[in-house]
């Protein structure tokens, strides 16, 4: 469970954020995320759509100096205690990445979602109801979300498989 929480923070948030953010965004968020003072997470999975990012229903609409996000992300590791979230939403139908801070008006997270295993990490829904985020929290370009996502998903998935092998290799059921 702890390995999953660490993986969600270090790879799905920090690594992904680093590669799609600009210098100003890194200066504001990276040091606290690297030190562990802030915990990060990635919001991609949606109720009813899972990881089908092309079917995603979360939207972001530009309104002056802000974007207004509406939608829900589910099964988000570190969603309960996270401070900042790399969230994917559609802008004019194109998948786009945003940084959402827990303090943004209109943002909330659900209670802890109970799980069968991996209890060392929390899981929650991220809820955006007319959530206002600064326009400077756009990560990369509008429509660049799929590129960021695909570039950064394989390393965590490989890491998760290695972590799980390490966990189960101690189980007598998998010994020769």
Residue spans of the language-model regions?
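Internal helix-loop-helix
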Residues: 1-37, 77-84, 155
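Short loop segments at secondary-structure junctions
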Residues: 20-22, 63-65, 90-94, 102-105, ...
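Short beta-alpha junctions and helix-cap segments that line functional grooves
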Residues: 29, 56, 72-74, 110-114
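A short, Trp-centered hydrophobic/proline-enriched beta-strand micro-motif
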Residues: 36-44
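Short Gly/Pro-enriched turn/cap motifs at secondary-structure boundaries
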Residues: 48-51, 75-78, 90, 115-122
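A structural signal for short hydrophobic beta-strand segments in well-ordered beta-sheet cores
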Residues: 58-61
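A short core secondary-structure module
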Residues: 66, 70-109
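Glycine-rich beta->alpha junctions and the first turn(s) of the following alpha-helix
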Residues: 108-176
